[in-house]
Amino acid sequence: MRRIFVQNRELVVPGTLLAQGPYKNGRGTFKEGSRIYSTVIGLVDIKGNTIRVIPLEGPYIPEVGDNVLGKIVDVKFSSWTVDIGSPYSATLKIQDYTDEKIDLLRTDLRKFFDIGDIIYAKVKGINEVNNIELTTKGMPFNGGPLRGGQIIKITSSKVPRVIGKGGSMINMIKKLTQSRIIVGQNGWIWISSKNPELEKLAIEAILKIERESHTRGLTDRIKNMLLSKLQELKERGVIEEIPSLEEETQEETVMENDVEARGP
């Protein structure tokens, strides 16, 4: 028998029967015979033959392929230690940053990334003791460091809601607030705008999404909130015109594709 008993993105509790048959069980589930059950309160995530449950609360648990934002907390001889908001240690080795041959005896790695720098990386591997290996190769902005802007942190399980279907929610926020935004699957979000008031508005919108992520009609509420706040800013002379959702730059297109690829 091959059957899935739940819908994708359905809220489930521990012990919920998710599927039966030749499916693979991912995080937040366990398998008993041919049946897969949930072990946490969370949202069902079905990808191909793999079924997992994304917890509604709790720390970020990384998976290989995740794109994350992180903060450099230590610089070593040939690597950096990175805080990604996980219970486990994350490391970026020099060979996972560049293919260039580096003379480590003569080179201080702080010339590339220093303590406190924010980087954008991909989870390359996780070993048997949960040490996390990162890579910045092929990442937008070459991994960073990301200059200016602000970092906000939300529960990682709320990231899909912030991104929206096909990147719809985050792209709406980016366009209306004219902000550059990078969303990490660990729940860390980098926001930067030339206008401090618009940057503040983007942050307000994202935090509202986190608070109301379980509710219906959220996209319309966020849109209406943004347009209302933008009208106030226009009346105060902070902005000249309310940005159009139809406008799109080449850079936004690149970022939209990147955001869409990160959606779970």
From Swiss-Prot:
InterPro entries (UniProt xref): Exosome_RNA_bind1/RRP40/RRP4 (IPR026699), KH_dom (IPR004087), KH_dom_type_1 (IPR004088), KH_dom_type_1_sf (IPR036612), NA-bd_OB-fold (IPR012340), Rrp4 (IPR023474), RRP4_N (IPR054371), RRP4_S1 (IPR048565)
Ranges annotated as biased composition (Acidic residues): 244-258
A Pfam family matched in the record: KH_6
Tree of life domain: Archaea
Limits of the S1 motif domain: 65-137
GO biological process: CUT catabolic process; exonucleolytic trimming to generate mature 3'-end of 5.8S rRNA from tricistronic rRNA transcript (SSU-rRNA, 5.8S rRNA, LSU-rRNA); poly(A)-dependent snoRNA 3'-end processing; RNA catabolic process; U4 snRNA 3'-end processing
Listed GO CC annotations: cytoplasm; exosome (RNase complex)
Region (Disordered): 244-264
TM annotation in the entry: none
Keyword set, alphabetical order: Cytoplasm, Exosome, RNA-binding
Compartments, record wording: Cytoplasm
A molecular function (GO) term: poly(A) binding
Ranges for domain KH: 147-206
UniProt family annotation: Belongs to the RRP4 family.
Record text on subunit structure and interactions: Component of the archaeal exosome complex. Forms a trimer of Rrp4 and/or Csl4 subunits. The trimer associates with a hexameric ring-like arrangement composed of 3 Rrp41-Rrp42 heterodimers.
Function field: Non-catalytic component of the exosome, which is a complex involved in RNA degradation. Increases the RNA binding and the efficiency of RNA degradation. Confers strong poly(A) specificity to the exosome.
Name of the protein described by the UniProt record: Exosome complex component Rrp4
